[in-house]
Amino acid sequence: MQPDLHCRTLAAHTLKHFRALSPLTHCMTNDVVQTFTANTLLALGASPAMVIDPVEARPFAAIANALLVNVGTLTASRADAMRAAVESAYDAKTPWTLDPVAVGALEFRRRFCLDLLPLRPAAIRGNASEILALSGMALGGRGVDTTEAALAALPAAQALARQIDCIVVVTGEVDYVTNGQRTLSIPGGDPLMTRIVGTGCALSAVVAASCALPGAALDNVASACCWMKLAGQAAAERSEGPGSFIPAFLDALYHLDVEAANATN
């Protein structure tokens, strides 16, 4: 199955809908990236909410437009809150996205993520090692870092997408987005995106928010990946290093004009 290059014209159209809807996105994410994730969503036009207590997480997941579950700093109590939120989202038909951070490196989070899969995530976003581990095809990875190229994990992503009936995103130098039948490739970005903490986690939040949009989920999620790649490229051109990249990246998301990027690339 050959990946198709994602159409930036479609990404531009999807971004207009995204900004008009401003999806209320319930982010149960890790402690390291809370602020960056919220600012990324705000810069693009979404409405983030970082609700984590189990008493609040269950009812809030039912009223949000989308839910993100990121297991980066998983604890037993946080797992209980996440499970409650996912069960509520499932009952309310709120689309939820799983970011299985370091799932191949630690057994507790691997079992937790596998236990959530029957509750039908709308999307799963991970690096190659994480997707391989979640699919059962490999275990390993250096914590949150990948030891595999994204393309190497594509067969696992396609099989997982068919098994769960969801969208699976494998991120890397080129991102691959698949529903198991059709696969889209999104090149771009910049190496500076790997020199700061949180770009992958923030992408998962944007993917989650995009799942709230009407239309084809595959195209919406691929558009989310395209937005982040374009913003990363634009920010890198204005940055001297990781310290100046972060504010430049948020500015690039805020001013993102995919149609203008099409005209100059």
From Swiss-Prot:
InterPro entries with a match to the protein in the record = Hyethyz_kinase, Ribokinase-like
Keywords, alphabetical: ATP-binding, Kinase, Magnesium, Metal-binding, Nucleotide-binding, Thiamine biosynthesis, Transferase
Picking any one GO molecular function of the record gives:
ATP binding
Query: Where does the chain bind ATP?
Result: R125, T171
Q: What is its EC number?
A: 2.7.1.50
Q: Which of the seven top EC classes does this enzyme belong to?
A: transferase
- Keyword Ribonucleoprotein: yes or no? no
Entry similarity comment: Belongs to the Thz kinase family.
Q: Which cofactor does it need?
A: Mg(2+)
Q: Does the keyword Transit peptide apply?
A: no
Q: Which cysteine pairs are covalently linked by disulfides here?
A: none
Question: Which reaction is the catalytic activity of this chain?
Answer: 5-(2-hydroxyethyl)-4-methylthiazole + ATP = 4-methyl-5-(2-phosphooxyethyl)-thiazole + ADP + H(+)
Q: What is this protein called?
A: Hydroxyethylthiazole kinase
**Pfam family of the protein (one):** HK
Which pathway or pathways does this protein act in?
Cofactor biosynthesis; thiamine diphosphate biosynthesis; 4-methyl-5-(2-phosphoethyl)-thiazole from 5-(2-hydroxyethyl)-4-methylthiazole: step 1/1
Free-text function comment from the UniProt entry: Catalyzes the phosphorylation of the hydroxyl group of 4-methyl-5-beta-hydroxyethylthiazole (THZ).
Species, as recorded: Salmonella heidelberg (strain SL476)
| UniProt gene name | thiM
Q: Which residues bind substrate?
A: M50, G198
